[in-house]
Every structure is written in structure tokens, then in C-alpha cells.
Amino acid sequence: PWEDNFNEILHNLDEIIKSGKIREVGISNEGAWGTMRYLNEAKNNSLPKIITIQNAYSLLCRPFEGDLAEIAHRENIGLLAYSPMALGVLSGKYIKGTAADNARLKLFPRFARYSSEQSTEATKRYLKIAEENGMTLAQMSLAFVNERPFLTSNIIGATNLEQLEENIE
């Protein structure tokens, strides 16, 4: 049978908490099954409960909205959304042709999910909606993520000061 190590991981994290090196426990890139395993192990063995989950979340990447959103709501677990700009796609730079040579999707083509025909079409439609409402695509994309009730914080990445200013505006 399949054996997992959720209990062992939580025991080790409990020791790190007790040593004062960390205060709380979170997970990353986990699905609904794994999240529930962590929660059950914590509850059944008086171990630390996870309080955050760090997963990708954006207008173009929304699997969290399924079972994980319900788990997060019911168990009071906050989402730390990474890649809320879908690796820069939701800045509009790829469809506008202004992406630098060192842009992520040019350097890492394996992230093709954001440059598929469907993603490109969705990005064009989102850009139109943003412009019709007096926002940049980046501002609208971050506003969408920030308005989710299960969000604790988003994790933005900016290559320059101009991008950072637009992201926090």
C-alpha cells in the first residue's frame, strides 16, 4: 500500500515551531487530498495546523476555486497566491509584443499553458475589459485576485520599479 509522510513532516515542523524558528505552518503546490491529509494528521495527533497554502492563482489559472477554495474557507486557511500575473502574461506585454528578450515565457517555454490559443484569447478579452474600465490589465488582474474571499495575500514579482509601482497602485 501507499505510505505517505504527512505525520512525519508535521512532527518535524512541530519541533521547529517549539525551537522558535517558525511560528506557523503552510504548504505549497498542494491539492485538496494532500491538504486534507495535513489537516487530519494535525487534528488527530495534536500537531500544528496549516494556516496557509501557496498555490498559483490568477485570471488564467483558477484550479484553486474548486475543492481547495471550499477547504480553505471551512478550515480557515489563507491562500498566498503566487503568479497572480500568470508569469507576466497578464501585463499584456506578450500580446502587445513588448516582452523583453529575458521575459520568463521566452526563457522558459515549458510554461506554455499561458501562451496557448485559449490563454491568448482570454488575455485579449481581459485587456479590452480593463481598458474599457480605465485600468491596465495588470491592475485589473491583481484586483481580481485581491478580491477573492479566500486570499490572504498575493505574491507579486516585478522586474523594475515601474512594474512594482503599477502592481501596488
Model regions and ranges:
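Beta/alpha (TIM)-barrel catalytic core signal, keyed to glycine-rich beta->alpha loops juxtaposed to Asp/Glu
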Residues: W2-E169
